[in-house]
Protein backbone atom coordinates (compact mmCIF):
# COMPACT_ATOMS: atom_id res chain seq x y z
CA UNK A 1 0.00 0.00 0.00
CA UNK A 2 2.79 2.43 0.94
CA UNK A 3 4.70 1.61 -2.23
CA UNK A 4 1.61 2.35 -4.32
CA UNK A 5 1.14 5.64 -2.48
CA UNK A 6 4.72 6.66 -3.15
CA UNK A 7 4.31 5.71 -6.78
CA UNK A 8 1.24 7.94 -7.03
CA UNK A 9 3.11 10.73 -5.29
CA UNK A 10 6.02 10.39 -7.71
CA UNK A 11 3.62 10.82 -10.60
CA UNK A 12 2.13 13.94 -9.01
CA UNK A 13 5.54 15.39 -8.24
CA UNK A 14 6.84 15.06 -11.77
CA UNK A 15 3.58 15.96 -13.52
CA UNK A 16 4.37 18.07 -16.57
CA UNK A 17 2.71 21.36 -17.32
CA UNK A 18 0.25 21.13 -20.18
CA UNK A 19 -1.13 23.78 -22.52
CA UNK A 20 -4.28 24.13 -20.38
CA UNK A 21 -3.80 25.82 -16.97
CA UNK A 22 -3.88 23.41 -14.06
CA UNK A 23 -6.54 25.45 -12.26
CA UNK A 24 -8.99 24.74 -15.11
CA UNK A 25 -8.16 21.04 -15.31
CA UNK A 26 -8.49 20.72 -11.52
CA UNK A 27 -11.97 22.27 -11.68
CA UNK A 28 -13.13 19.77 -14.34
CA UNK A 29 -11.51 16.92 -12.42
CA UNK A 30 -13.33 17.91 -9.24
CA UNK A 31 -16.63 18.13 -11.13
CA UNK A 32 -16.05 14.68 -12.64
CA UNK A 33 -15.35 13.13 -9.24
CA UNK A 34 -18.55 14.58 -7.78
CA UNK A 35 -20.57 12.84 -10.51
CA UNK A 36 -18.65 9.56 -10.18
CA UNK A 37 -20.68 6.87 -8.30
CA UNK A 38 -17.42 5.59 -6.76
CA UNK A 39 -16.46 9.07 -5.61
CA UNK A 40 -16.85 8.29 -1.89
CA UNK A 41 -14.36 5.41 -1.92
CA UNK A 42 -11.97 7.45 -4.04
CA UNK A 43 -12.25 10.35 -1.60
CA UNK A 44 -11.36 8.05 1.32
CA UNK A 45 -8.40 6.66 -0.60
CA UNK A 46 -7.23 10.14 -1.52
CA UNK A 47 -7.45 11.16 2.13
CA UNK A 48 -5.24 8.21 3.10
CA UNK A 49 -2.76 9.12 0.39
CA UNK A 50 -2.76 12.75 1.48
CA UNK A 51 -2.22 11.82 5.13
CA UNK A 52 0.65 9.48 4.25
CA UNK A 53 2.11 12.15 1.99
CA UNK A 54 1.94 14.78 4.74
CA UNK A 55 3.53 12.54 7.39
CA UNK A 56 6.31 11.43 5.05
CA UNK A 57 7.01 14.98 3.91
CA UNK A 58 7.15 16.45 7.41
CA UNK A 59 9.43 13.66 8.64
CA UNK A 60 11.82 14.02 5.73
CA UNK A 61 11.90 17.83 5.91
CA UNK A 62 12.75 17.63 9.62
CA UNK A 63 15.38 15.00 8.90
CA UNK A 64 16.82 17.07 6.07
CA UNK A 65 17.30 20.17 8.21
CA UNK A 66 17.83 18.83 11.73
CA UNK A 67 20.39 16.13 10.87
CA UNK A 68 23.00 18.50 9.34
CA UNK A 69 22.60 20.89 12.29
CA UNK A 70 23.08 18.12 14.85
CA UNK A 71 26.06 16.71 12.94
CA UNK A 72 27.52 20.21 12.69
CA UNK A 73 27.33 20.85 16.43
CA UNK A 74 28.48 17.36 17.40
CA UNK A 75 31.49 17.41 15.06
CA UNK A 76 32.41 20.94 16.12
CA UNK A 77 32.36 20.38 19.88
CA UNK A 78 33.40 16.72 20.13
CA UNK A 79 35.66 16.08 17.11
CA UNK A 80 37.18 19.20 15.59
CA UNK A 81 37.01 21.37 18.71
CA UNK A 82 39.43 19.41 20.93
CA UNK A 83 41.81 18.72 18.02
CA UNK A 84 42.00 22.33 16.86
CA UNK A 85 42.29 23.67 20.42
CA UNK A 86 45.19 21.28 21.05
CA UNK A 87 46.99 22.15 17.80
CA UNK A 88 46.22 25.86 18.16
CA UNK A 89 47.87 26.01 21.60
CA UNK A 90 50.87 23.85 20.74
CA UNK A 91 52.90 26.87 19.69
CA UNK A 92 52.36 30.60 19.90
CA UNK A 93 48.65 30.93 19.03
CA UNK A 94 47.82 32.85 15.88
CA UNK A 95 45.59 35.74 16.88
CA UNK A 96 44.35 37.07 13.55
CA UNK A 97 43.37 35.14 10.43
CA UNK A 98 42.73 38.21 8.29
CA UNK A 99 43.08 41.97 8.20
CA UNK A 100 39.42 42.54 9.09
CA UNK A 101 39.99 41.06 12.54
CA UNK A 102 43.01 43.32 13.04
CA UNK A 103 41.02 46.40 12.08
CA UNK A 104 38.21 45.52 14.48
CA UNK A 105 40.66 44.80 17.32
CA UNK A 106 42.63 48.00 16.77
CA UNK A 107 39.45 50.07 16.55
CA UNK A 108 38.14 48.58 19.79
CA UNK A 109 41.46 49.20 21.57
CA UNK A 110 41.52 52.77 20.31
CA UNK A 111 37.98 53.37 21.59
CA UNK A 112 39.05 51.98 24.97
CA UNK A 113 42.02 54.37 25.14
CA UNK A 114 39.80 57.29 24.18
CA UNK A 115 37.31 56.27 26.86
CA UNK A 116 40.04 56.29 29.52
CA UNK A 117 41.29 59.66 28.32
CA UNK A 118 37.73 61.02 28.47
CA UNK A 119 37.30 59.74 32.04
CA UNK A 120 40.56 61.43 33.07
CA UNK A 121 39.41 64.73 31.60
CA UNK A 122 36.07 64.49 33.41
CA UNK A 123 37.75 63.81 36.77
CA UNK A 124 40.91 65.91 36.91
CA UNK A 125 40.92 65.73 40.69
CA UNK A 126 41.62 62.00 40.68
CA UNK A 127 45.30 61.15 40.70
CA UNK A 128 45.63 58.61 37.88
CA UNK A 129 49.21 57.95 36.89
CA UNK A 130 50.43 57.08 33.42
CA UNK A 131 51.47 53.62 34.65
CA UNK A 132 47.92 52.81 35.74
CA UNK A 133 46.51 53.90 32.38
CA UNK A 134 49.15 51.88 30.55
CA UNK A 135 48.36 48.81 32.64
CA UNK A 136 44.64 49.08 31.91
CA UNK A 137 45.35 49.38 28.18
CA UNK A 138 47.69 46.40 28.36
CA UNK A 139 45.05 44.27 30.09
CA UNK A 140 42.51 45.29 27.45
CA UNK A 141 44.97 44.34 24.68
CA UNK A 142 45.47 40.90 26.22
CA UNK A 143 41.71 40.48 26.53
CA UNK A 144 41.26 41.36 22.86
CA UNK A 145 44.08 39.01 21.90
CA UNK A 146 42.41 36.10 23.67
CA UNK A 147 39.04 36.97 22.16
CA UNK A 148 40.27 37.12 18.57
CA UNK A 149 42.47 34.05 19.01
CA UNK A 150 39.35 32.12 20.06
CA UNK A 151 37.42 33.66 17.16
CA UNK A 152 40.12 32.50 14.72
CA UNK A 153 40.10 28.98 16.16
CA UNK A 154 36.30 28.89 15.99
CA UNK A 155 36.43 29.96 12.34
CA UNK A 156 38.57 26.92 11.50
CA UNK A 157 36.15 24.70 13.44
CA UNK A 158 33.22 26.25 11.58
CA UNK A 159 34.76 25.52 8.19
CA UNK A 160 35.38 21.85 8.97
CA UNK A 161 32.02 21.26 10.67
CA UNK A 162 30.15 23.07 7.87
CA UNK A 163 31.84 20.84 5.29
CA UNK A 164 30.67 17.77 7.20
CA UNK A 165 27.13 19.18 7.38
CA UNK A 166 27.11 19.81 3.63
CA UNK A 167 28.25 16.24 2.98
CA UNK A 168 25.49 14.90 5.23
CA UNK A 169 22.90 17.07 3.46
CA UNK A 170 24.08 15.89 0.02
CA UNK A 171 24.03 12.26 1.19
CA UNK A 172 20.45 12.63 2.42
CA UNK A 173 19.44 14.21 -0.89
CA UNK A 174 21.04 11.39 -2.89
CA UNK A 175 19.62 8.55 -0.81
CA UNK A 176 16.16 10.11 -0.42
CA UNK A 177 15.02 10.52 -4.03
CA UNK A 178 11.65 8.88 -3.34
CA UNK A 179 11.06 11.05 -0.27
CA UNK A 180 12.03 14.15 -2.26
CA UNK A 181 9.37 13.28 -4.83
CA UNK A 182 6.80 13.02 -2.03
CA UNK A 183 7.91 16.38 -0.59
CA UNK A 184 7.65 18.03 -4.02
CA UNK A 185 4.13 16.70 -4.44
CA UNK A 186 3.24 17.85 -0.91
CA UNK A 187 4.56 21.37 -1.53
CA UNK A 188 2.81 21.55 -4.89
CA UNK A 189 -0.50 20.68 -3.26
CA UNK A 190 0.01 23.40 -0.65
CA UNK A 191 1.01 26.06 -3.18
CA UNK A 192 -1.73 25.27 -5.67
CA UNK A 193 -4.27 25.10 -2.86
CA UNK A 194 -3.69 28.75 -2.02
CA UNK A 195 -5.93 31.43 -3.41
CA UNK A 196 -4.69 33.68 -6.21
CA UNK A 197 -4.42 36.60 -3.80
CA UNK A 198 -2.32 34.54 -1.37
CA UNK A 199 -0.02 33.40 -4.17
CA UNK A 200 0.45 36.95 -5.39
CA UNK A 201 1.07 38.18 -1.83
CA UNK A 202 3.77 35.55 -1.23
CA UNK A 203 5.47 36.35 -4.54
CA UNK A 204 5.53 40.07 -3.77
CA UNK A 205 6.75 39.38 -0.21
CA UNK A 206 9.68 37.21 -1.30
CA UNK A 207 10.67 39.36 -4.25
CA UNK A 208 10.65 42.55 -2.17
CA UNK A 209 12.50 40.81 0.63
CA UNK A 210 15.32 39.38 -1.50
CA UNK A 211 15.48 41.67 -4.54
CA UNK A 212 13.56 44.75 -3.41
CA UNK A 213 14.76 48.29 -2.82
CA UNK A 214 15.93 47.64 0.76
CA UNK A 215 17.33 44.15 0.14
CA UNK A 216 20.99 45.26 -0.41
CA UNK A 217 21.26 46.25 3.26
CA UNK A 218 20.05 42.81 4.32
CA UNK A 219 22.40 41.06 1.90
CA UNK A 220 25.30 43.14 3.23
CA UNK A 221 24.62 42.00 6.79
CA UNK A 222 24.22 38.36 5.70
CA UNK A 223 27.50 38.34 3.75
CA UNK A 224 29.40 39.98 6.62
CA UNK A 225 28.08 37.38 9.06
CA UNK A 226 29.02 34.51 6.72
CA UNK A 227 32.52 35.86 6.08
CA UNK A 228 33.10 36.37 9.80
CA UNK A 229 31.72 32.90 10.53
CA UNK A 230 34.28 31.36 8.14
CA UNK A 231 37.16 33.60 9.19
CA UNK A 232 37.42 35.26 5.78
CA UNK A 233 38.34 38.92 5.23
CA UNK A 234 35.32 41.22 5.06
CA UNK A 235 36.25 42.82 1.76
CA UNK A 236 33.99 45.77 1.01
CA UNK A 237 34.68 45.41 -2.72
CA UNK A 238 33.50 41.79 -2.70
CA UNK A 239 30.41 42.62 -0.63
CA UNK A 240 29.39 45.51 -2.88
CA UNK A 241 30.01 43.41 -6.00
CA UNK A 242 27.86 40.62 -4.59
CA UNK A 243 24.91 42.81 -3.60
CA UNK A 244 25.01 44.55 -6.98
CA UNK A 245 24.85 41.32 -9.01
CA UNK A 246 23.22 38.52 -7.01
CA UNK A 247 19.84 40.25 -6.38
CA UNK A 248 19.68 41.05 -10.10
CA UNK A 249 20.19 37.37 -10.92
CA UNK A 250 17.49 36.39 -8.42
CA UNK A 251 15.11 38.95 -9.88
CA UNK A 252 15.69 37.51 -13.36
CA UNK A 253 15.01 33.98 -12.09
CA UNK A 254 11.78 35.11 -10.39
CA UNK A 255 10.53 36.82 -13.53
CA UNK A 256 11.43 33.86 -15.73
CA UNK A 257 9.65 31.48 -13.33
CA UNK A 258 6.53 33.65 -13.39
CA UNK A 259 6.59 33.90 -17.19
CA UNK A 260 7.55 30.31 -17.98
CA UNK A 261 5.88 28.27 -15.26
CA UNK A 262 3.35 30.12 -13.11
CA UNK A 263 1.76 31.78 -16.13
CA UNK A 264 0.81 28.32 -17.45
CA UNK A 265 -0.14 26.77 -14.12
CA UNK A 266 -2.19 29.64 -12.67
CA UNK A 267 -2.65 32.61 -15.02
CA UNK A 268 -5.21 34.16 -12.66
CA UNK A 269 -2.54 34.32 -9.93
CA UNK A 270 -0.19 36.09 -12.34
CA UNK A 271 -2.89 38.61 -13.19
CA UNK A 272 -3.57 39.20 -9.49
CA UNK A 273 0.17 39.60 -8.90
CA UNK A 274 0.46 42.28 -11.59
CA UNK A 275 -2.58 44.13 -10.22
CA UNK A 276 -1.23 44.07 -6.66
CA UNK A 277 2.25 45.08 -7.79
CA UNK A 278 1.05 48.16 -9.69
Curated annotation (Swiss-Prot):
Catalytic activity: K(+)(in) + H(+)(out) = K(+)(out) + H(+)(in)
InterPro entries: CemA
Compartment(s) of residence: Plastid, Chloroplast inner membrane
Listed HAMAP family: CemA_PxcA (MF_01308)
Protein purpose: Contributes to K(+)/H(+) antiport activity by supporting proton efflux to control proton extrusion and homeostasis in chloroplasts in a light-dependent manner to modulate photosynthesis. Prevents excessive induction of non-photochemical quenching (NPQ) under continuous-light conditions. Indirectly promotes efficient inorganic carbon uptake into chloroplasts.
One Gene Ontology cellular component: chloroplast inner membrane
Bilayer topology term: Multi-pass membrane protein
Keyword terms of this UniProt record: Antiport, Chloroplast, Hydrogen ion transport, Ion transport, Membrane, Plastid, Plastid inner membrane, Potassium, Potassium transport, Transmembrane, Transmembrane helix, Transport
Example GO BP: potassium ion transport
Name used for this protein in its record: Potassium/proton antiporter CemA
Principal location listed in the UniProt entry: plastid
One MF term in the entry's GO annotations: antiporter activity
Record bears the keyword Secreted: no
Record-stated family: Belongs to the CemA family.
Membrane-spanning parts: 61-81, 155-175, 203-223, 238-258
